[in-house]
């Protein structure tokens, strides 16, 4: 995985520099859509087929996305470069790194919230608001439910983890009692 990240980083950074000259959100949508298409085994199979030209593969990728940015010369050049260098499989990692650069520029971060119970809109908004104050940045939450937490939440923002779950507290108490 680290090797993929190392190879994908220059592509993501170059694409981000191009996106800074225009609409970063639209470019983000494009790269996310391309990543979804590149995850399809059928697309990877077609891309590696000797019967299909590289130009045809690039056209296939661009035809599969809805983003209006795909019609631009920069997007076409980017996709053609990936196809020519046999880097289509890197698109999911490029999308991840592009999103990280976008978040860094916006002063935002992705927050993975794991809750013992489903969170409704008001509860989630209140939780995110409090977390934004704690982490001092805008958060983009994704929520999962894990009943094994028993109660509370576990929040991961980048490499920081805030675990207020009952399971974590019980583990802490067990460690203190057995020490």
Curated annotation (Swiss-Prot):
<dbReference type="InterPro" id="IPR000711">
    <property type="entry name" value="ATPase_OSCP/dsu"/>
</dbReference>
<dbReference type="InterPro" id="IPR026015">
    <property type="entry name" value="ATP_synth_OSCP/delta_N_sf"/>
</dbReference>
<comment type="similarity">
    <text>Belongs to the ATPase delta chain family.</text>
</comment>
<protein>
    <recommendedName>
        <fullName>ATP synthase subunit delta</fullName>
    </recommendedName>
</protein>
<keyword id="KW-0375">Hydrogen ion transport</keyword>
<keyword id="KW-0406">Ion transport</keyword>
<comment type="subunit">
    <text>F-type ATPases have 2 components, F(1) - the catalytic core - and F(0) - the membrane proton channel. F(1) has five subunits: alpha(3), beta(3), gamma(1), delta(1), epsilon(1). F(0) has three main subunits: a(1), b(2) and c(10-14). The alpha and beta chains form an alternating ring which encloses part of the gamma chain. F(1) is attached to F(0) by a central stalk formed by the gamma and epsilon chains, while a peripheral stalk is formed by the delta and b chains.</text>
</comment>
<keyword id="KW-0139">CF(1)</keyword>
<dbReference type="Pfam" id="PF00213">
    <property type="entry name" value="OSCP"/>
</dbReference>
<comment type="function">
    <text>F(1)F(0) ATP synthase produces ATP from ADP in the presence of a proton or sodium gradient. F-type ATPases consist of two structural domains, F(1) containing the extramembraneous catalytic core and F(0) containing the membrane proton channel, linked together by a central stalk and a peripheral stalk. During catalysis, ATP synthesis in the catalytic domain of F(1) is coupled via a rotary mechanism of the central stalk subunits to proton translocation.</text>
</comment>
<keyword id="KW-0066">ATP synthesis</keyword>
<comment type="function">
    <text>This protein is part of the stalk that links CF(0) to CF(1). It either transmits conformational changes from CF(0) to CF(1) or is implicated in proton conduction.</text>
</comment>
<dbReference type="GO" id="GO:0005886">
    <property type="term" value="C:plasma membrane"/>
</dbReference>
<dbReference type="GO" id="GO:0046933">
    <property type="term" value="F:proton-transporting ATP synthase activity, rotational mechanism"/>
</dbReference>
<keyword id="KW-0997">Cell inner membrane</keyword>
<keyword id="KW-1003">Cell membrane</keyword>
<keyword id="KW-0472">Membrane</keyword>
<keyword id="KW-0813">Transport</keyword>
<dbReference type="GO" id="GO:0045259">
    <property type="term" value="C:proton-transporting ATP synthase complex"/>
</dbReference>
